[in-house]
Amino acid sequence: HMPDAARVHYAYLDAGGIAPNVVQARATVRQLIRSPSLGGLSSLVERVRAIAEGAALMSGTRVTSRVFSAVSNLTENRPLSEAMQAEFEALGPVPFDAEDAVFASSIRESLSREDIADTFERLAMKPDYDMALCDFIAPLDRPFMGGMGSTDVGDVSWAVPTVQARVATCAVGTALHSWQQTAQGKAPAAHKGMLHAAKVMAATARRALTDPALIAAAKKAHESHLAEYPYTCPIPPETRPPVGEG
C-alpha cells in the first residue's frame, strides 16, 4: 500500500540470462520512484528497498542498491504565483488561429474521450469535447487531481522563490510521452505557446524587478515554507555520475 498519487516504475536492465525455471546468478533492475513530496519520497524509497531485501531473503540471494539521480518536488510560492497569474490574464490566452485549430482537431480525433475529460478534470472544469485548443487561462486555485512531472526546477524552488508557467502548446487531451505530443512538437501552435510562455515569464520578471514588495513577500513565503518543511537533497552525498556505465 502507498499513497494514490505515488508511483513506482521499473525496467529490467539485466535479467541474468535466458534459461527458465532457475534463479539467475545476477539481475539488475532500475526503479523510478515518485511522490508528490520529499517526505513521501523518502519513506517510499525505503519501502522499495525493504521489498527488494525481502525478495533476496526469500530467494537466498543478496541485493545492493544505489541512487543514480533524484529531483525534488516543485514548491509553490504564492506571491509569485499570483503575480504570474495576473500577468498571464493581462496577456490573455495563446493567440491560436484557425489553422492551428484545424491541425489540433485532426490530432484530437486520435484521442479518447477519457484523455480529453482528464484534462478538464485536472482543472476542476466540465469537459468540452469540441474544444481543440485551450482558449482560456486556468484558474490559479484548483484542487490537486494527481499526476505530476519531474524537473530539476523543483530543487531550484527549494533554494530560491520560484514560479513556473503552464501554457498550452498542443491539442486538448494530449497525453505526455505520446506520439501525439511528438507529432505536435514543431507545429506552429507549439511555437506560439512557447513564445507566449516566454512573454508571461518576462512580464512576471518585470513586475518582480519593479515591485520590491513582491520580492519581499516572495522571500517571506519561501522562508516560511522552509521553516515548516526543511530541505534535504534527495541525492545522497556519496553519489557520483554513472559515467561510462552501460
Regions flagged by a language model, labelled:
Residues 96-104, 213-223:
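Short, flexible loop/turn segments with low-complexity composition
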Residues 1-114:
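Midchain, well-structured core segments that form catalytic/ion-binding scaffolds
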Residues 202-210:
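Short glycine/serine- and small hydrophobic-enriched flexible loop segments
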Residues 32-40, 209, 237-246:
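C-terminal domain-closing interface element
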Residues 84, 156, 201:
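Hydrophobic, well-ordered secondary-structure elements that form the walls
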Residues 1-6, 210-216:
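Phosphate-handling active-site elements
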